[in-house]
Amino acid sequence: MRKTVLAVALAVVVVLVAASMTYYVSRNSPLGSDNSECSDPGSISSHVYNPYRLTIIKSCIRASGVVENVFDEADGDYHVRLALDSQYSNLTNSANDQYQFGDLVVEVICALPITQADAVSACQNYTNNITIPSVNDRVIVTGPYVLDTQHSNWAEIHPVYTLTIS
């Protein structure tokens, strides 16, 4: 009887470990990239204004493409529209098609003077060191892949962890 209980307990532990590993990999493996390229340097995510509005799909992904447009936002972010390279075309959705000309939204946070009063506290004690791209720059970005629930659930990388102009 004691051996049976031990065997059952061991089996339960093995199943729980396997399930935990599967969950961890599914939540943390970026699309099109390995985890070595994707991390949150300096806890950038802790400086996102009203993070509750973002539904995290993947904790970190990599994507590349050409910058279509760059907008200043009142919350201090740069809103970058990225025309994705074909291998990343699955990252956009119908809301991106309808409101963002089919582009992925890429948000570089706390990079501008903040003119929206309730956003000021999010950027306190954080200095953004990410280079801001120009229109027509080819870039590679990493960061959380999210849906913005306050903007029709369009897809974004928000915040950008790294941005390389290539």
Q: What is each PLM-predicted segment?
A:
Residues 2-9, 16-166:
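OB-fold and OB-like single-stranded nucleic-acid-recognition modules
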